[in-house]
Amino acid sequence: MNRTTPDQELAPASEPVWERPWSVEEIRRSSQSWSLAADAGLLQFLQEFSQQTISRTHEIKKQVDGLIRETKATDCRLHNVFNDFLMLSNTQFIENRVYDEEVEEPVLKAEAEKTEQEKTREQKEVDLIPKVQEAVNYGLQVLDSAFEQLDIKAGNSDSEEDDANGRVELILEPKDLYIDRPLPYLIGSKLFMEQEDVGLGELSSEEGSVGSDRGSIVDTEEEKEEEESDEDFAHHSDNDQNRNTTQMSDEEEDDDGCDLFADSEKEEEDIEDIEEITRPKRNGPTSFADELAARIKGDAVGRVDEEPTTLSSGEAKPRKTLKEKKERRTPSDDEEDNLFAPPKLTDEDFSPFGSGGGLFSGGKGLFDDEDEESDLFTEAPQDRQAGASVKEESSSSKPGKKIPAGAVSVFLGDTDVFGAASVPSLKEPQKPEQPTPRKSPYFPPPTGLFDDDDGDDDDDFFSTPHSKPSKTGKVQSTADIFGDDEGDLFKEKAVTLPEATVSQTDENKARAEKKVSLPSSKNLKPSSETKTQKGLFSDEEDSEDLFSSQSASKLKGAPLLPGKLPTSVSLFEDEDEEDNLFGGTAAKRQTLSLQAQGEEKAKASELSKKKASALLFSSDEEDQWNIPASQTHSASDSRSKGESRDSGTLQSQEAKAVKKASLFEEDEEDDLFAIAKDSQKKTQRVSLLFEDDVDSGGSLFGSPPTSVPPATTKKETVSEAPPLLFSDEEEKEAQLGVKPVDKKVESAKESLKFGRTDVAESEKEGLLTRSAQEAVKHSDLFSSSSPLDKGTKPRTKTVLSLFDEEEDKMEDQNTIQAPQKEVGKGRDPDARPKSTGVFQDEELLFSHKLQKDNDPDVDLFAGTKKTKLLEPSVGSLFGDDEDDDLFSSAKSQPLVQEKKRVVKKDYSVDSVKNQKHPETIQGIKEKGIWKPETPQDSSGLAPFKTKEPSTRIGKIQANLAINPAALLPTAASQISEVKPVLPELAFPSSEHRRSHGLESVPVLPGSGEAGVSFDLPAQADTLHSANKSRVKMRGKRRPQTRAARRLAAQESSEAEDMSVPRGPIAQWADGTISPNGHRPQLRAASGEDSTEEALAAAAAPWEGGPVPGVDRSPFAKSLGHSRGEADLFDSGDIFSTGTGSQSEERTKPKAKIAENLANPPVGGKAKSPMFPALGEASSDDDLFQSAKPKPAKKTNPFPLLEDEDDLFTDQKVKKNETKSDSQQDVISTTQDIFEDDIFATEAIKPSQKTREKEKTLESNLFDDNIDIFADLTVKPKEKSKKKVEAKSIFDDDMDDIFSSGIQAKTAKPKSRSAQAAPEPRFEHKVSNIFDDPLNAFGGQ
C-alpha cells in the first residue's frame, strides 16, 4: 500500500510532483519507491527550504541591524548625555573658578542664607516672592535694557511695568550695544596699544558710574526697603534674588543674546526703570539684598553706587547686584557682542581683560569654545552659557551660582569665564587654528604635493633647510656623500638620512608642504620649518601624513638608497636600468631623489656652506624644489623632486646664482616633465623601483641610465640617426627623430627598458630621461658616488666650473643641461643615456627653458661647446654612451640589440647613430650625414642648441663653447691635456672645436678646474631658462627635438663646416677628438669614412670618453681628456679600464689618454666596436662585430685610434689590465676623477685632490668626469648587474659599459660619476675587478 500509495499519489501528482516542492511526508512515502519525480520534488523542496532559510536569514539580519542601530543610537544618546554632563560640569567649573574670586564671600553668605532658608520654609516661601518678582523684573529689565521701546525710552521708571509690558508687546527694538558702549579701539591701533582699557575701560567705568548712580538711587531706596525687610527674609530674598538674578540674567542673556547690542543703553535705562519698578516689588527682596550687601560690605549703598564699577560689590545687594549684574551682564552681553565694547563691562579689568582678553581671545577663539554661541565676543555666548550654566548652577549650586548669576560673578565670571573659558577656548580654538594654519598649509599643500611623493622635494624643501644643517655633515662628507658613496651620501643620507631621512622625511613632508604651498612653502618654511623642525622630527605626523609616502619613500629610499648605493654602483646596469628603466628610473629617481635629496641637500648644504648660491641652492633648491615640487608635485613629486633635485640641484646650484625661479621652473618643468612622468611612473615605481633598485641599486640609477641611454641614444639617435637609430630602434623615435632626444631617449629607454614598449612612457621617460637623466645624472651623480650631488656640486661647480667660467648662463644651462647631459653623458653614457636624453630632453627642458634663449634644447651639447664638442660628443656620447647606455639599458633587455646598438653606438658614438647597426653603415653614412646634423642633434639637441641658438648657439657656443670645455672641466684641462695628449687625437681640431665649438676651451681648463670646483656651483641661469623652457619643452620637446634635428642637420652643416675644418677625421684618426673629431665627423658628413671613422672614433672617444668630452660634458671632460677623458669615458665606458685608465689617464693624462683611449676599447668592448667603428669606416660591421666580437672591437679601436691605439691598446690591454688595473685605476682614477670633481666633493675627494693635481686638466674633464665618475661610483653596481647582463662580452663591457658602459659612460657625463659608476659597473660587468673600483670609490 505504501508503494501503491506513493505511486498512485505520484501518478496523479506526477505532473505537479516534479513541478512543485514535495512535502516531507511525500518524500517519506516516496522513499521506498524513489523516482525522478521524487528527485524533482525533493529538489523543489530543498530549493524552497533554502529560499526560506535565506529569507529568514535576511530578516534576522535586518533585525540584528536594527538592533545594532538602536544600540548605537542608545550609545550615542548616552554619550550625548554624558557629554552634556561634562559640559555642564566644565561650565560650572569654569564659572565657579571665574566667580570664586568675586563670589567667594557671596557664595558663603548665600550658603548661609540657604541654610537659613532651609531652616525656615516660610522664609523660603517668602523668598520665592522676591525671586518671582526678580524674575519678572529681570524680564522687564531685559526688555528695557536689551530693547528700546519706541514709545518710551527706558528712563521712565514710573510706568515702567505697564510700559515695559506694552513695550514688549508693542515696539521693542534691540538696543544698539554700541551706543552706550562704543566699540573698543581697533586692535593694533595706537589707542589700543596705548590704553590699557583699549577703549573698554572708560565706557565700562562710565557705564558702571551710570549704573552706580542709578544703582545708588535704587540702592538707597532698596537699602531703605532692606532696612524694612527682615534679615532672614533679606537672606532668603537675597538667595531668591540671586536665583532670580540668575534667572533674570539668563533671561537677560537670552534677550541680550538676541539683543546683545540693544542691551547696553536700554539695559541701563531699563535697569533704572526696572530697578524703580523692581523696588516696589523688591522692597522685601531688595531690602534683603541691600541688607545683605550692607552686612557683607557695610557700605552697601556707597558701594552700590560703585558696584557697577566694582563687581566685587556683587554681594552688596542681590537686587542691586542683579541690576548691576544686569547692567554689567548686559554690558557683558553687550560686551559679548562687543567684546571690545567697553561701556558696559563694568569690570574694565575683566572686561578689557576678559572681554578685551576675551574679546581678543574671542578673536583668538578664547571665547570660541564657550563663546561659540554667536558672538565673536565670547562674553555674550558665555553670558548665555553663563546664563544657562547660571540657571543650571542656580538650580544645582545656587549659592555659588547665584553669585555667578549675580552681576559680579556673572560679569567677572564672564570675564573670567572668558579668561578661563576663553583660555580653554583659546587653547582649543587656537589649537585648531594653529594646526589649521599649519596643517592647512601643510595639508592643503601636502595633500596634492605630498601625495605625489614630492616628499623628496619636500624633503629638500624642508630637508634642505633643515637637512642642510643635518647635511652639513653630509656636505662635509660631500666627498663622503658624493665621493664617499652614494652609499655614503645615502649612508650618510641613510645614516644621516635616519636623521636626514627623518629630517628629509619630515622635510619631505615639510618640503612637500613647502611645495604644496610654494607661496606658503616659504611661509611654511618658517612655519613648516618650525613645524618641520618639529615636523622634521617632531611634526612628522603632519609632514609624514602629508608626506608619509614621501617619508616612506624617502625612508625606503634612505634604506634602499644605501642598499642601492651598492646597487647604484651598478647603478647603470642595464638589467636594472631596463627593468627599472621606468621603475628603476623612478626608483632611481627617487633613489636619486633621495640620494639627490640627500646629496643635493648635502650638496645644498655644501653649496649653502660653500656658497650663498649654495644657499640659493639649498634654499633655492628647496624653493626650486618647492616650485618644481609644487608643479611636479602632483605629477611626479618624488621623482620630480628627485630629479628636480637632481637636475635642480645642478640647475639650482647653477641656477642658484642665476635663477631661483627658473631653477624651480626648470626643475619643475624639467622635472615636472621629466620627473612628472617619471614621477608618475616612478612614483608608482618608487617603492618598487627602490625595491627593484635596491635589488638593482645600480638599476636604480641604472634604470634611469637605461632611460638615460635612451635619452642619450635619443640624442645621438636624434642627432645622428634619429631615423636610423630609431628606425632601427624605433621608427617612432625616428619619427620622434625630431623629438628623438625626447622620444629616442624615451624610446631608447623603452627599447632598452621596455623595448620601446612605452612610447608614452618612453616619452615620459624621455621627459623622465631628461629629468630622469638629470636625475640619473644626479642619480648617477648620486649613484656613482652620489655623483649627482657631487656631480651636481661638481657639476654645479664642476659643471658650473666647467661652464661656470664662461658659460655660467649657458653653462648653467649647459652645465645643468650639458653638464647634466654631459654628466648625464659622461655618466649617462652608462647612466646617462637618459641623462643625455635628459640633457637633451632636459636640456631641451633646460635648454628650452634655459635655452629658449639658447633655443637649442641641446644647450648641453648644442651649445657651441656642446654643439661642437658636445655635438660630436653628444652624438658619440649619446651614440656611444647613450646608445651604449640605451643599449646597456636595452642590453639588459636586449643585450645584443642594445649591444649592437650600443656597440654600434659604441662603435661609432656616431655609429650609435649608426648604431642602428641594422642601419649600420647607412646609419653611419646617414648618421655621418646625420651626425653633422645629429651630432648637433646628438649633441643633442646640441644642434638644437647649436642651431636654434645659432644666435644662441653663438651665445651658447660661446657660452657652450665654454660649456663643453666647462662640461669637460677636465676636458678643459683635458683640452689642455688633450692638446698635448690628444694632439695625437687630433685634439687640436678637437680643441678648435672646443675652442670654437667650446669657445671656452681656454675656459674649459679653468672651467674644468675652476669652473668645476665645488665652490663654483653651476649657475642656475641657464637652468632657469632650461626649467622654463623645460616645462614648455615638455610640450615643445618634440618640436624642439625636431627642431633640434633640423638644427642638428643645420648645425651638422655648421658643425661640419666647423668640425670638418677641424679635421673630424684627423681628430678621429687621432681618436682624441672624439668630441671634436666625433662631432666634426658627425658634422663632417662629407667624409663618411671620416664620418664613420669619426663616428667610430667619436663613438670610441665618446665611449672612450674623449668624444664624450664634447658630447658628454662629463665626456666633455672625457673629451677634455679627449682621449684622456676618452679613457675616463672609454674607461668610463669600459669604465673599469676606462675609469682606471681615466684615473690613470688623469694621472697620466697624455699617456693615459692615449692608453685609456685604447683602454676604453679594451675596457669597453662596445668601445672597441666603437673604436673599430672609429678605426674603420665600415666599422659598423665591426661595430656589430666589435660590439658582439670583443676582439674585433678591440682591434677596431686600435685602427680607429692610432693615437688612441695606445689609448685603445691600453684600454684593450688595460681592458683586461684595466679591468683589473682599470678597476684599480678606475678605483684610483675614478676615485681621482671623482676626487677631482665629484669625488673631490664626493667619494674620492682625496683621490680627487690627487687627481685634481693630475687632473688639473682632468679637473675640467673630471669636473664632468668627476660627476661622471661620481656616476661611475654609482655605476659600479649597475656594472655588476650589467656584468651579469652584459657580463658575457667586452661587448657587454663596451656595450655594457656603453650599454652598461655607455650608461657608465653616460653615467660619466651624467655625473661624471657615470664613469665612476660605469667603472664599478664595468667592474661588475666586465669583471669583479670593477667591484674593486666600487670599493675603490670608497665602497661606492
From Swiss-Prot:
A motif (LFa 15) lies at residues 1128-1135. Component of the WASH core complex also described as WASH regulatory complex (SHRC) composed of WASHC1, WASHC2, WASHC3, WASHC4 and WASHC5; in the complex interacts (via N-terminus) directly with WASHC1. The WASH core complex associates with the F-actin-capping protein dimer (formed by CAPZA1, CAPZA2 or CAPZA3 and CAPZB) in a transient or substoichiometric manner which was initially described as WASH complex. Interacts with VPS35; mediates the association with the retromer CSC complex. Interacts with FKBP15. One of its GO terms (biological process) is retrograde transport, endosome to Golgi. The keyword Transport applies. A motif (LFa 10) lies at residues 725-737. The LFa (leucine-phenylalanine-acidic) motif bind directly to VPS35 of retromer CSC; adjacent motifs can act cooperatively to bind multiple CSCs, although there is significant variability in the affinities of different motifs for retromer. A motif (LFa 5) lies at residues 536-547. This is WASH complex subunit 2. Residues 201-404, 421-586, 618-663, 695-838, 906-950, 987-1205, 1301-1325 are annotated as: Disordered. A motif (LFa 21) lies at residues 1329-1337. Acts as a component of the WASH core complex that functions as a nucleation-promoting factor (NPF) at the surface of endosomes, where it recruits and activates the Arp2/3 complex to induce actin polymerization, playing a key role in the fission of tubules that serve as transport intermediates during endosome sorting. Mediates the recruitment of the WASH core complex to endosome membranes via binding to phospholipids and VPS35 of the retromer CSC. Residues 1-219 are annotated as: Sufficient for interaction with WASHC3, WASHC4 and WASHC5. A motif (LFa 6) lies at residues 571-582. Residues 232-241, 292-306, 506-516, 636-646, 740-767, 822-833, 916-930 have a biased composition (Basic and acidic residues). Keywords: Cell membrane, Endosome, Membrane, Phosphoprotein, Transport. The modification Phosphothreonine is found at T330. A motif (LFa 17) lies at residues 1200-1208. A motif (LFa 19) lies at residues 1261-1269. InterPro entries: FAM21/CAPZIP. GO terms for cellular component: cytosol; early endosome; early endosome membrane; plasma membrane; WASH complex. A motif (LFa 12) lies at residues 838-846. Residues 936-1340 are annotated as: Interaction with phospholipids. A motif (LFa 4) lies at residues 481-490. The keyword Lipoprotein does not apply.
